[in-house]
Amino acid sequence: MTQYDVVIAGGAMAGATLALALSHLTDNQLKVAVVEPYQVDTSHPGFDSRSIALSYGTVDILRRFQLWPSIAPCATPITDIHVSDRSHLAMTDISAQQVGVDALGYVVELADVGRIYQSLLQRCESISLYTPAAVDRVERFTDSVSVHLNNGETLQAKLLVAADGAVSNCCQQLGMNLAQHDFEQIAVIANVVTEQAHRGRAFERFTEHGPVALLPMSDNRMSLVWCLPPDLAEQVMLLSDEQFLERLQQEFGWRLGQMQKVGMRASYPLILRHREQNISHRFAVVGNAAQTLHPIAGQGFNLGIRDVASLAEEITKQLDDVGAYSSLMRFKQRRCGDRQNTIWMTTSLVHLFSNDYLALRVARNLGLVMMDNLSGLKQPLLRQTLGLVSR
């Protein structure tokens, strides 16, 4: 049985960020184990690489943990965000220049960040990486937790952290209740190329079927997230590339000129999942294991990184017992407001912008017009978009 201070189940962005943050904040004083079922694929997926958007606040967190310098060279800045409603004049724009920042956020490819984090984890003397391996069974005692892996090894620690995704095996084993709401939408994702260069612009276009988002990537690609009812999503997935681009053109419009190329498509159901409790005895939950949101406002991953930052800070306040109940309660209290507010905001946006009822159509267009002309109404949206929220 190998002894650690913290065992983290899940070595993707949330889990790896937590491990590296603990290393930085404690100057390698804590022994940390990261258990990850999947080894990083060293081959790059090329044109079809999947990506995520990091908010300004998330980048600030990564800077403080000394992680951003490694990620920055492969990040594409978002300098403008354009929000509009199809077939109506209402729109609002947010620009980095107006806000007084270099970028509103950045888009990074998961393949790039995965390789960077893998290298950082392997070079860190206080972190042990178990991969491919998964948590098979968890036993909790008064002062410790035993984590049994599917490769036969057993790890003992003061704290187990679940960062193992939306359908968290650790949370299921420990009976952490999961609340779910099916949005009855499917996200169709792909990378596309448009006639006009994106120039760092991100777009969110609301339609009667659901939102269409385009995020700027390297090599003038754009990352598409197209939210549709299940029947329409099935139709769209069966279209030829040419037909797909024509349908997308109809929904998005000509703001970027002609849609010229689309890569491999994928789809997944959009379901709100959130744990009612994010702590238990010797146990904490972060990232998608704590909550998985609709992508309408790009908040899910950034909310998870705020989980990670708050937990890392609380752990390092009590190094003699990193899994102490007092530390976990402080973490829970810090995260409560942000979690509730972000979940409420995201869900409200889905219901407001994903249908064509006349009353809601008028309301959302009026809202976009008012936000574009009244800075007082725009500020709350701006702060949430930038990730500048209390945690």
Model-identified regions with their sequence ranges:
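Beta1/beta-strand and adjacent pyrophosphate-binding region of the FAD-binding site
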Residues: 1-12, 33
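N-terminal Rossmann-fold NAD(P) dinucleotide-binding loop
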Residues: 15
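C-terminal helical "tail/cap" subdomain of flavin- and related membrane-associated enzymes
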Residues: 313-391
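Glycine-rich FAD pyrophosphate-binding loop
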Residues: 23-48
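N-terminal FAD cofactor-binding segment of flavoenzymes
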Residues: 46-86
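Conserved FAD-binding catalytic core of PHBH/FMO-like flavoproteins
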Residues: 62, 160-258, 262-265
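FAD/FMN-dependent oxidoreductases across multiple families
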Residues: 234, 238-325
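Conserved N-terminal helical subregion
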Residues: 74-173, 181-186
